[in-house]
């Protein structure tokens, strides 16, 4: 009896890339296919579905500069990674290779093209990421989370399907939890996160903002905040002084459940975060990561803000005073919070993993 077809999933080693890959993997396995993950060494923290024997680490390199030395180093690392990926694929013989963005996807996708293996890339951002842009003209098909991402390029648009962002089972379970309207007598459940890698700006700004709040509102706060290890002591010192009921950690493995329990989220606006806020339907204050060449987080935050589900604040305007004012205004207007939660949900697509799995099987001719 022959083995089931194998689908190789390639993703950068952060949650924003790995979680959609995991969500697709769950659906493909339910359909009787085999899956493996190709990534970098960072992925073990977020591996989830993928046990160690289902993961292949291939060296890659992020483009970190334009000097001849930096470009040469990048070229050498990508070349070595591609050679290893070719050997891996000749051994595994996948039916298709699916990329989810990040520079670690370049070697396996380059190798797949060299071996004439069908390929597909998925991009969750409102602006396509750089690694996916490098691959876009070389792959068999493209999937995007949002409509219109490639409409300005007829050649790419012709092979693009809008699927949404695949959601892990934990997110789908959280999406079934209804938003709890804010009650003046109950705690305000505030969740502060900075993406899968954390964000120092939250440690710099949020404690000062909470220090600005009216004491009556401060006493109602039930705070959960992602804080990097190096920032933990100074953040905790402020909250201890303010006597805030809080839970602080560098990483929350149960973040979907915490999102579901929240009534207001303060966060960066990576593609995965925005998609999960839409799927679960929670109001948010989003602070896009500044300095990105393509301003993808600014565009991502705009998707939720334009729908009425979020307030977007650029980092230059993200001060303790501004955040305190926004939290105070929202806490005083429970109906607005509920309306934002409803609006956010209009952005989410809960069937995205199945839609992407359909496209994968079409590309792989299964």
From Swiss-Prot:
GO cellular component terms given for this protein: plasma membrane
Superkingdom as given in the UniProt entry: Bacteria
Pathway membership, UniProt: Cell wall biogenesis; peptidoglycan biosynthesis
Principal localisation: membrane
CDD domains, sorted: GT28_MurG
Catalysed reaction, written as an equation: di-trans,octa-cis-undecaprenyl diphospho-N-acetyl-alpha-D-muramoyl-L-alanyl-D-glutamyl-meso-2,6-diaminopimeloyl-D-alanyl-D-alanine + UDP-N-acetyl-alpha-D-glucosamine = di-trans,octa-cis-undecaprenyl diphospho-[N-acetyl-alpha-D-glucosaminyl-(1->4)]-N-acetyl-alpha-D-muramoyl-L-alanyl-D-glutamyl-meso-2,6-diaminopimeloyl-D-alanyl-D-alanine + UDP + H(+)
Keyword line: Cell cycle, Cell division, Cell inner membrane, Cell membrane, Cell shape, Cell wall biogenesis/degradation, Glycosyltransferase, Membrane, Peptidoglycan synthesis, Transferase
Record-listed UDP-N-acetyl-alpha-D-glucosamine binding positions: 14-16, 125, 168, 196, 297
MF terms in GO: UDP-N-acetyl-D-glucosamine:N-acetylmuramoyl-L-alanyl-D-glutamyl-meso-2,6-diaminopimelyl-D-alanyl-D-alanine-diphosphoundecaprenol 4-beta-N-acetylglucosaminlytransferase activity; undecaprenyldiphospho-muramoylpentapeptide beta-N-acetylglucosaminyltransferase activity
Pfam families to which the protein is assigned, alphabetical: Glyco_tran_28_C (PF04101), Glyco_transf_28 (PF03033)
Topology of this chain in the membrane: Peripheral membrane protein
GO BP of this protein: carbohydrate metabolic process; cell division; cell wall organization; lipid glycosylation; peptidoglycan biosynthetic process; regulation of cell shape
Catalytic activity, EC: 2.4.1.227
Parts of the chain that traverse the membrane: none
Stored PANTHER family: GLYCOSYLTRANSFERASE (PTHR21015:SF22), UDP-N-ACETYLGLUCOSAMINE--N-ACETYLMURAMYL-(PENTAPEPTIDE) PYROPHOSPHORYL-UNDECAPRENOL N-ACETYLGLUCOSAMINE TRANSFERASE 1 (PTHR21015)
HAMAP family: MurG
Protein name stated in the entry: UDP-N-acetylglucosamine--N-acetylmuramyl-(pentapeptide) pyrophosphoryl-undecaprenol N-acetylglucosamine transferase
Lineage: Bacteria, Pseudomonadati, Pseudomonadota, Alphaproteobacteria, Hyphomicrobiales
